[in-house]
UniProtKB/Swiss-Prot annotation:
GO biological process terms on file: defense response to fungus; killing of cells of another organism
Source organism: Pisum sativum
Pfam family, one: Gamma-thionin
Protein name: Defensin-2
Tissue specificity as recorded in UniProt: Epidermis and vascular bundles of pods, stems, roots, leaves and wet or dry seeds.
InterPro entries the record matches: Defensin_plant, Scorpion_toxin-like, Scorpion_toxin-like_sf
Protein family: Belongs to the DEFL family.
Role: Possesses antifungal activity sensitive to inorganic cations.
Length: 47
């Protein structure tokens, strides 16, 4: 099972998804990340 949490440390506009995805994996050591409709970075993790 996975769940999404808003990234607490991602800076800047969340376009494109790649920036957010990289941030979640490299900086927060989570599975992945994506930009949602609110233009914020949401990280996916196991929960």
């Amino acid at each position: 099972k996975t769940c999404e949490n808003l990234s607490g440390t991602f800076k800047g506009p969340c376009i494109p998804d790649g920036n957010c995805n990289k941030h979640c994996r490299n900086n927060e050591h989570l599975l992945s990340g994506r930009c949602r409709d609110d233009f914020r970075c949401w990280c996916t993790n196991r929960c």
